[in-house]
From Swiss-Prot:
Catalytic reaction list: [pyruvate, water dikinase] + ADP = [pyruvate, water dikinase]-phosphate + AMP + H(+); [pyruvate, water dikinase]-phosphate + phosphate + H(+) = [pyruvate, water dikinase] + diphosphate
Protein name, per record: Putative phosphoenolpyruvate synthase regulatory protein
Organism in which the protein naturally occurs: Xanthomonas euvesicatoria pv. vesicatoria (strain 85-10) (Xanthomonas campestris pv. vesicatoria)
Alphabetical list of PANTHER family matching this protein: PYRUVATE, PHOSPHATE DIKINASE REGULATORY PROTEIN 1, CHLOROPLASTIC
Claim: Transferase is one of the keywords in the record: yes
UniProt entry tagged with the keyword Transferase: yes
Residue numbers binding ADP: 153-160
Function recorded in the entry: Bifunctional serine/threonine kinase and phosphorylase involved in the regulation of the phosphoenolpyruvate synthase (PEPS) by catalyzing its phosphorylation/dephosphorylation.
Length: 273
């Protein structure tokens, strides 16, 4: 049996919901080469027919049944997509009927409705959080009074992408502080962070993985040397333990999981956008 399987994330909006759920499902299966494609703004019958043709063509090309993760809210669009012969995984369908029964009200299948529930205030909060993350990246700005969280780690341990994810998806003002050679030499919490203990969260990483990442950026240097990576990670982990800073290894952990752990550990209650 072929290990290649085409997967399409189809939506009448951006496709982020379908792709996020689909990715979470696919990660449960190893040994497959999932060829993914996102088809966004499929919001009328003509676009749905074109999408179905693309899905069908992929099935013929790979000689295997495609998978469609579908978040279109209009049942008619879903029916057209199903004509492709793909395995249809509808994001909303399993929940709509029980909700209709519970609420004693029919749903309104308005295209794009599920993607238009974010008000201006929420949008403004997200943009402000993103600007904050960028201006407080890698220790650029050290005024952390307005920060919701400060990620602390050695260089290239995953601080920046986690901060950006927290900003975009939760509106969290996330700053990050890179542990410098001086910080690591002292093996103590840097003075500029001591007034913000309740906001600190440490990220650690397997030294071998850290070396791989650093080699891509600065190959064959002291910065990317195996001994340097082992030393920095060991000191950072001792510091987190000594200073009682909660921490998490990013080695085999997704950004989504890291972000969720940060929020729950620091007691930050925010709904996902």
């Amino acid at each position: 049996m072929s290990t290649i399987r085409p997967v399409f994330y189809v939506s009448d909006g951006t496709g982020i919901t379908a792709e996020t759920i689909g990715h979470s499902l696919l990660t449960q299966f190893s040994g497959f080469n999932f060829v993914t494609d996102r088809m966004s703004f499929i919001d009328d019958a003509d676009k749905a027919r074109d999408a179905a043709m693309r899905v069908r063509a992929a099935g013929e090309r790979y000689q295997v049944r495609p998978v469609v993760v579908n978040s279109c809210v209009d049942p008619q669009l879903s029916m057209i997509l199903a004509e492709s012969g793909a395995l249809m995984l509808d994001v909303f369908a399993p929940f709509i009927e029980p909700l209709e029964r519970e609420l004693n009200a029919p749903r309104h299948s308005r295209v794009g409705r599920a993607h238009g529930m974010v008000d201006f205030e929420t949008y403004h909060r997200r943009i402000n959080a993103m600007n904050f993350a960028l201006s407080h990246d890698d220790g650029i700005a050290l005024n952390y009074d307005e920060a919701d969280v400060i990620l602390v780690a050695v260089s290239r341990a995953g601080k920046t992408p986690t901060c950006i994810y927290l900003a975009l998806h939760y509106g969290i003002r996330a700053a990050n502080y890179p542990l410098t050679d001086e910080d690591l030499e002292n093996e103590q919490l840097p003075p500029r962070l001591r007034n913000y203990r309740s906001k600190l969260f440490g990220l650690t990483i397997d030294p071998e993985r850290l070396q791989q990442i650093r080699q891509e950026r600065r190959a064959n240097s002291r910065y990317s040397a195996a001994e340097t990576c082992r030393r920095e990670v060991a000191i950072a982990e001792r510091m987190f333990q000594m200073e009682r800073i909660p921490s998490l290894s990013t080695t085999n952990t997704s950004i989504e999981e890291i972000s969720s752990k940060v929020l729950s550990t620091l007691g930050l209650q925010r709904e996902m956008f």
